[in-house]
């Protein structure tokens, strides 16, 4: 595949769409195991709390930083003792051109995090392994579905605001 083909995601109305990774890096990482070593004496029945969010920063024309924030807290069922807390901020700088509005938002909140997730997942797995806990393999995340849910919530909020405004104007 040529470089031109790699950079061109799609072509719309004669405008070439470009999504190019400039750099992928770890912005922040934390691993805590506050109840070691006695947690190893308990039967391993973990309860996992997984949180995920993204942050986007416009750095320059057609240049964006996307940061994927993942937090995993594992407690023991029954005792509620914290086994470990792992937090990773995996970021990347992306050159994006040829997209506007909803398409750009989709790229920044779905396609870019989708590229970052394998790096974050591997880092979390490695940190948990170094803590000598059983393997933790995070399931893939459907960022497209999360984006659709977000857009539906935004649309519902806009419709709700429009209805409230309409009610106020009637009274």
UniProtKB/Swiss-Prot annotation:
Gene Ontology annotations for the cellular component aspect, listed alphabetically: cytoplasm
Molecular-function GO terms, alphabetical: unfolded protein binding
Subcellular location, record wording: Cytoplasm
InterPro entries xref list: SecB (IPR003708), SecB-like_sf (IPR035958)
Gene3D superfamilies on file: SecB-like
Keyword match Protein transport: yes
Keywords annotated in UniProt: Chaperone, Cytoplasm, Protein transport, Translocation, Transport
Any one biological process term the GO annotation gives: protein folding
Domain of life the protein comes from: Bacteria
Subunit structure: Homotetramer, a dimer of dimers. One homotetramer interacts with 1 SecA dimer.
Record family assignment: Belongs to the SecB family.
Classification via NCBIfam families: PRK05751.1-4 (NF004393), secB (TIGR00809)
Free-text function comment from the UniProt entry: One of the proteins required for the normal export of preproteins out of the cell cytoplasm. It is a molecular chaperone that binds to a subset of precursor proteins, maintaining them in a translocation-competent state. It also specifically binds to its receptor SecA.
Record-given protein name: Protein-export protein SecB
Taxonomic lineage of the native organism: Bacteria, Pseudomonadati, Pseudomonadota, Gammaproteobacteria, Pasteurellales
Gene name, Swiss-Prot/TrEMBL: secB
